[in-house]
UniProtKB/Swiss-Prot annotation:
One of its GO terms (biological process) is D-ribose metabolic process. This is Ribose-5-phosphate isomerase A. It comes from the Bacteria. Pfam families: Rib_5-P_isom_A. It comes from Pseudomonas fluorescens (strain Pf0-1).
Length: 224
């Protein structure tokens, strides 16, 4: 199977997982990126089965609306049963690196609210140790140099992602060469740097379920 076919398979698996648990009042949290887009397209076939969605980015909101799915502001939603999103890396404990698409802050907020966080990814994203994929950090623009110096002290090699502004108007530093053996601790350390909005480690709030697309079919992993 191609990578696109794997993405479509896990997207459909996520729809199949949540659909029996939805009703006409349900609101679904939706992530950002190519795998999340596959989920949106699959979910749209059943848009009469739920009320609407909360989007983690402007791009996701536009795609949902294009399918005729109502999009709600998170502040108006009291209960979010599911959040479905892709990942750039996952370990066996379902700690994730996310943010390749620069939507990490809003993704992290929606994940924090959701009762169940379902990660959908192809098998190449499952790794023994996080960090081969550069860790994105969202930074207030005036703090860029300060934050970069602090990230070097933590052992990383931060690179400014040129030409990219987040939906919140901030910049991204991608931190290379990290061996992330304690993701919960590193997430907290980076977030404690003045000027950091958040970083792409989802470890304090990892995924609850990982639907992994493999050549043998979709495998379901739960956090160990």
């Amino acid at each position: 199977m191609t990578q696109d076919q794997l993405k479509q398979a896990v997207a459909q698996a996520a729809v199949d997982f949540i659909l029996p648990k939805l009703d006409d009042k349900s609101i679904v949290g939706v992530g950002t990126g190519s795998t999340a887009n596959c989920f949106i397209d699959a979910l749209a076939q059943h848009k009469g089965a739920f009320d609407g969605a909360v989007a983690s980015s402007e791009a996701t909101a536009a795609r949902l609306k294009g399918h005729g799915i109502p999009v709600y502001e998170l502040n108006t939603v009291s209960n979010l049963e599911f959040y479905v999103d892709g990942a750039d890396e996952s370990d066996e404990h379902l700690n994730l690196i996310k943010g390749g698409g620069a939507a990490l802050t809003r993704e992290k907020i929606v994940a924090a609210v959701a009762q169940t966080f379902i990660c959908i990814a192809d098998a190449s994203k499952l790794v023994p140790v996080l960090g081969a994929f550069p860790l994105p950090v969202e930074v207030i623009p005036m703090a860029r140099s300060h934050v970069a110096r602090q990230l070097v002290k933590l052992g990383g090699d931060p690179v400014y992602r040129e030409g990219v502004l987040t939906d919140n108007g901030n910049i991204i530093l991608d931190v290379h060469n990290l061996q992330i053996t304690n993701p919960v601790e590193l997430e907290a350390q980076i977030n404690a740097i003045v000027g950091v909005v958040t970083n792409g480690l989802f470890a304090a709030r990892p995924a609850d379920l990982l639907l992994l697309g493999t050549s043998e079919g979709v495998k379901t992993l739960k956090a160990e």
